[in-house]
Amino acid sequence: MTDYLRSTALLLVLLNPFLLIVYLIDVVEKLDRKQFAKVLTRAGLIATAVFWFFAVLGDTVFSDVMQAEFASFQIFGGIVFLLIGLQFVFRGPTTIDILRGESQHLAGAIAMPILIGPGTISASVIIGKRHDAIPACGTVLAAVLISILIMIGLKALHDFVRPKREALVQRYIEIAGRITALFVGT
């Protein structure tokens, strides 16, 4: 049981909903709660399917299909995160708009650069090594579900607090954005 909790915590830490909500602040402000929940649920389903794929197939995808070492993928992912962190430092919150791009399908645009990345894929591979296929998939589902539910709750909190405390919300976004730059860059 402890291994399952550790595996869930591993992915949940990487899917940090308190950090992800800052990335999605433009979506939080534009969509109502029902639309936001619908888009985020779709993005969560896309991410879960990708994580399941890597949890079940693991190193096989890298060694046999891509013919690359898993460690090389992790190094590449670190370099990508370093570059994104530098973009956050120099460009601020507009960086996420550049990463996400103009997408007609918002769920896919949220899933790929925000939920699915080198860190979460690596965590899925590690979870797949720790557990058999079905428990690994359950662990991944639990982590993604918890993250999505927390973000929906944060959207509700944002909608409740924003009309009364606009300056406080903007200050939180500014501070969290700076912390994000440090976190992403490390």
Question: What does each of the following model-derived ranges do?
Answer:
Residues D3-F53:
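Juxtamembrane transmembrane-helix termini in multi-pass membrane transport proteins
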Residues M1-L14, F90-A111:
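Small-residue-enriched transmembrane helix starts and helix-helix packing motifs
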Residues A37, T41-F88:
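Membrane helix-loop-helix hairpins that form the core translocation module of multi-pass transporters
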Residues D32-I46, A133-A142, E174-I175:
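Membrane-interface alpha-helices at helix entry/exit sites of multi-pass transporters
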